[in-house]
Amino acid sequence: MSLQYHVLNSIPSTTFLSSTKTTISSSFLTISGSPLNVARDKSRSGSIHCSKLRTQEYINSQEVQHDLPLIHEWQQLQGEDAPQISVGSNSNAFKEAVKSVKTILRNLTDGEITISAYDTAWVALIDAGDKTPAFPSAVKWIAENQLSDGSWGDAYLFSYHDRLINTLACVVALRSWNLFPHQCNKGITFFRENIGKLEDENDEHMPIGFEVAFPSLLEIARGINIDVPYDSPVLKDIYAKKELKLTRIPKEIMHKIPTTLLHSLEGMRDLDWEKLLKLQSQDGSFLFSPSSTAFAFMQTRDSNCLEYLRNAVKRFNGGVPNVFPVDLFEHIWIVDRLQRLGISRYFEEEIKECLDYVHRYWTDNGICWARCSHVQDIDDTAMAFRLLRQHGYQVSADVFKNFEKEGEFFCFVGQSNQAVTGMFNLYRASQLAFPREEILKNAKEFSYNYLLEKREREELIDKWIIMKDLPGEIGFALEIPWYASLPRVETRFYIDQYGGENDVWIGKTLYRMPYVNNNGYLELAKQDYNNCQAQHQLEWDIFQKWYEENRLSEWGVRRSELLECYYLAAATIFESERSHERMVWAKSSVLVKAISSSFGESSDSRRSFSDQFHEYIANARRSDHHFNDRNMRLDRPGSVQASRLAGVLIGTLNQMSFDLFMSHGRDVNNLLYLSWGDWMEKWKLYGDEGEGELMVKMIILMKNNDLTNFFTHTHFVRLAEIINRICLPRQYLKARRNDEKEKTIKSMEKEMGKMVELALSESDTFRDVSITFLDVAKAFYYFALCGDHLQTHISKVLFQKV
């Protein structure tokens, strides 16, 4: 039984030619007297059956069993009851899912974030001036949002730190106004029964400032006669931690310049409010913290504080989050998630608006989670820097000098600590360094070593977020650097790592970001991945037929190499709609291998094949595009074999050109010949130079838009020179020998840095071409560096459905 694949937007069959009035350009050659003789590549119809037998033959071949044993998993995907897989993504459900995400992206404001019971309780404590709550809606929210066990906090993830500080704050607020005694007593009971459990909690997941804020709440509770075990050993330990931390707080500095201490004023004493009010944020808050701002208002009755709190309470219908706004954080992290999930192409316009927004608030000192902040952090700065640079915005690497001191990098200016995710995002950003950006070179070395050490100690736990698989994300990044990270490989792993709505952030309390951690994104990504994978499996079947029918094994191309060629193309150019680009890359790679394997040994044999190729084309033109193999000169050694392979090459180029003409009305036949002729001139002289440039040209020729006028552009020439130094087959061999691997990879890295600078700093007019160069270079770099991962990645990316 075979799997049936329904091809949406299928390539017209050759029989369509006879029934159409379209005139094919004269540059399509006619070989051996047939109307259009192309390298044989069948199975072009509206509904195509992907042969189980052919795939089974591939799996059972001794060669593949030796080289790629993990492909046996593909057998399990083609059982007797295998379902039909729809290739494409134009179903109504898929379109609606895309539309829903677009709606989210088009309506981003100050950030969607869950309400914090702790911060709401601080707002509820504010006196209107007449012994009544200034924010009765906050009191009401507390009363209506108690959990069934008597606590307050995140309802889906139980953390004693989170539940106890939220519960104590809410109990204090209700008792202060003598309201809702039943809820208050339930909360006290929960607190008394569970306070001892703090001893067993992981300090890494302790809320921000817990050791300062929690004792302060206990003092308020004691003052209003709330009966809790104040002499509990665990509370004594927390008091000791508070005193230690308070002694380390630079009181003089915190009153002069904005620091993260402004976020947690409610836990401090002996504050000079006249000085602190000068450090207030533009929106009236103290570093965007409702609880800190509520405490400040109680001490100062400042009208700007009150206005901020009123806006927050109104925005969240009575409650307030632990931090607000979070606009920059939300904009940046959404783009990152959509990009890593492999679905960003559906939202290009919306993503540009997101990044325009972030760039508008970018400063030389960096950014933080909210706009117009006087305090910046390395986490948001690194994430924004990476995305902005990737998308062509001009941002300076000097921004990271603000977070560096004596060779180390820190989360906040003036502090001396790191967080795993902060260093992870610094590491990711540092890999987009341009040559001569020493600060990023230092950042890469520091963050890599930091993460490596944390992984070795099994300490990949973060103080900012509880994630599904943070160790997996970091492990992937450490093993597959960005230069070698292919889009489909990253997405295949990230789909398994992304926790969606189950990921929880850690602030003063646990909180969630529904537009950042969204199950809808995950489901859309899974469906899109499976759609693309089905298309790839269909193409892989066609690709094998082309290989067999043209007997390419006779020219030294093994089946395992065939799969590697297709995989590199599909893992890089993965989109279903880019089939022409993907297939031309894969076939061109195989043909280069066949030609080099059969005729690359000596300059004479290379020259012989090159002459045969050019003679094929010249004869065709002399005979009005009709010629027969009998017209070819066969007096040179090996010319029969050369003639056959040249025929396969030209036939394949004809088919590529024909397919593009039928689907997009563009005739690129002569340009295909010229591109291969240019490659042969380099190959004839040097043996293995020019393959990278050839692949880029092939891909560009197959694009929907005509970019061929860039082939003579000085920028193109510079990029071509670089990629031809990266994409040298002899380098792969050296890279896989332990004694030369490090030296070879460093040499390639140097060229990759030049490539990144040229590709990412280019204007919109040349950007598509530049990114194509970068994509191809990354694929070659991946092949040289990641040989140990190749089998696993091929199996996972091409054959394992998500």
From Swiss-Prot:
InterPro entries: Isoprenoid_synthase_dom_sf, Terpene_cyclase_plant_C1, Terpene_synth_N, Terpene_synth_N_sf, Terpene_synthase-like, Terpenoid_cyclase/PrenylTrfase. The Asp-Xaa-Asp-Asp (DXDD) motif is important for the catalytic activity through binding to Mg(2+). Inhibited by high concentrations of magnesium. It comes from Arabidopsis thaliana (Mouse-ear cress). Expressed in roots, leaves, flowers and also in siliques. GO terms for biological process: gibberellic acid mediated signaling pathway; gibberellin biosynthetic process. Belongs to the terpene synthase family. Tpsc subfamily. It is found in: Plastid, Chloroplast. Its main location: plastid. GO terms for cellular component: chloroplast. GO terms for molecular function: ent-copalyl diphosphate synthase activity; magnesium ion binding; terpene synthase activity. A motif (DXDD motif) lies at residues 377-380. The keyword Metal-binding applies. It catalyses: (2E,6E,10E)-geranylgeranyl diphosphate = ent-copalyl diphosphate. This is Ent-copalyl diphosphate synthase, chloroplastic.
